[in-house]
Amino acid sequence: INAALDAGVDAILHCAFYDNDGSYRFDQKTADRLAASEVWLNPTMGLGNANRVRLANLKSERKLTQDEEERLERSTVSGENSLAQFSALVKAGVKLVGGSDCGWSYYPFGDFQGEIMSLHAAGLSPIQAIYAGTRSPAAALGILESIGTVEAGKEADLLVVNGDPSLDLECLRD
């Protein structure tokens, strides 16, 4: 993370506080440095969630292989670390942008809502999580003047839902 900040990147995807030996180690000083920067952070937490759901569903249908059991255990620990990490980064004030990696591995197309819900689970309010999936990506790409919010003169795709996503993000799946 520090090397990326030193290099002057605009965004970091799949940001994680892992040491070279693979052990998880959150570093508040680095988190504060990231929060003070103009760098956008894309956690892509939904990808790990999709893998855990897939393996849990398999486990309910049949006995998992040893490899699958090990992957589920690693993914569960990684997911817990990721949620704790991004919760701490939200508290530090890091600029989060939603991104899903959908279509890769076990993450299906059409479930960007899962990433928004993951951002909410990490500590963003429902509206902040929605912004992280709409306004923030446009701002991160430098195209907020033409997309990212519903305003006169801007292009927009609208999702009409049965409910109030500021109260319940689950209605984004309607």
Predicted regions and their residues:
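His/Asp/Glu-enriched, well-ordered alpha-helical/loop segment
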Residues: 67, 79-164
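Conserved protein kinase catalytic core
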Residues: 20, 107, 168
